[in-house]
């Protein structure tokens, strides 16, 4: 995942630090959003194709990950429809996976995040 530009949406400071460290340790470039609305705004203002993947927490204040993903997917630009969006959540039940798919998310990673799995899922998503 070296050289990838990743939008990381996470409201918990410790989780953000851990995820950011894991990603930067693998050579990725990380832009942080602290809630769903911020993630949508950062993506909307970015150049088309600027981000390679979005890591989206589900439970966030202001706007949750499901709503944020739906808004990103509805933007009038090509990359909004195809950018991989990976849910990161403590809720790893089948029902949550279905909700993530319905919102337009491509993958689902359970917290606490396993670094090797995270890298594998990102790599497979952008491949």
How would you describe each model-predicted region?
Residues 1-127:
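C-terminal compact regulatory domains
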